Amino acid sequence: MNSNDQDPIPFRPEDNNFSGSKTYAMSGKIMLSAIVILFFVVILMVFLHLYARWYLLRARRRHLRRRSRNRRATMVFFTADPSTAATSVVASRGLDPNVIKSLPVFTFSDETHKDPIECAVCLSEFEESETGRVLPNCQHTFHVDCIDMWFHSHSTCPLCRSLVESLAGIESTAAAREREVVIAVDSDPVLVIEPSSSSGLTDEPHGSGSSQMLREDSGRKPAAIEVPRRTFSEFEDELTRRDSPASQSFRSPMSRMLSFTRMLSRDRRSASSPIAGAPPLSPTLSCRIQMTESDIERGGEESR
């Protein structure tokens, strides 16, 4: 018989089972490896998360520690002007009782006030024959009891916060704008030179024909001089106008007095010996007056 005529190998179920078990074993190993790798990845993520939290907390603690160290090392000093501090303390205490009493008071009635008026402190309307105060700056009205209680701890209007004391004290400020200065004038002998002619005013040798006489008053005579209060801006304006051409024709009495004082000091330096024929002057005499024609012309030009 030929080999081709032999019977084929019969199929055995055991061979199929062996191949299937081998496939299952391979897939099980792959699954186990994937689970292990995934487990390690999860562990790594958890570790990174914990490390990040630890690092951030450590950096925050360092920052807080550095800030606290800087606060301890830094010393801050505050200085204040005593006058400014006193002003702020007085302002926080409220208005003066005299200023509160000086505020105008009115009595509410339907005849005088047709429109209803509401008090901003107690939020109630005025009733018949109730008294109220009007603030001079903002013209706001309030009950007397309400606004007086408010002004014990405040110095501004409850509605617009405008100052009240600045306008309430206008009368006292205006009354104090002028001061009365009393100067005691020592009436020592004063030398008066009466020229006989216009040419007698020139510088001549002592003992000339001009008549000299001394006028004496006994005791002291008080002189009351009213000096108006002038602000710094007024003095500044006067200084700026002094060099202008218009200032040559108009000058204040103070500038005239200064010019006359300069003229007296110049004449006092020029006078070296007493006038002949005149009695000796007392030691308290301020100066000897010796006027010339040029001085009179100069004084006239300065007083214009």
Curated annotation (Swiss-Prot):
SMART domains: RING (SM00184). Its main location: membrane. Residues 227-244, 295-304 have a biased composition (Basic and acidic residues). InterPro entries: ATL1/ATL16-like, Znf_RING, Znf_RING/FYVE/PHD. It comes from the Eukaryota. Pathway: Protein modification; protein ubiquitination. Keywords: Membrane, Metal-binding, Plant defense, Transferase, Transmembrane, Transmembrane helix, Ubl conjugation pathway, Zinc, Zinc-finger. Residues 194-304 are annotated as: Disordered. PROSITE patterns: ZF_RING_2 (PS50089). Residues 283-293 have a biased composition (Polar residues). Belongs to the RING-type zinc finger family. ATL subfamily. May be involved in the early steps of the plant defense signaling pathway. This is RING-H2 finger protein ATL2. It comes from Arabidopsis thaliana (Mouse-ear cress).
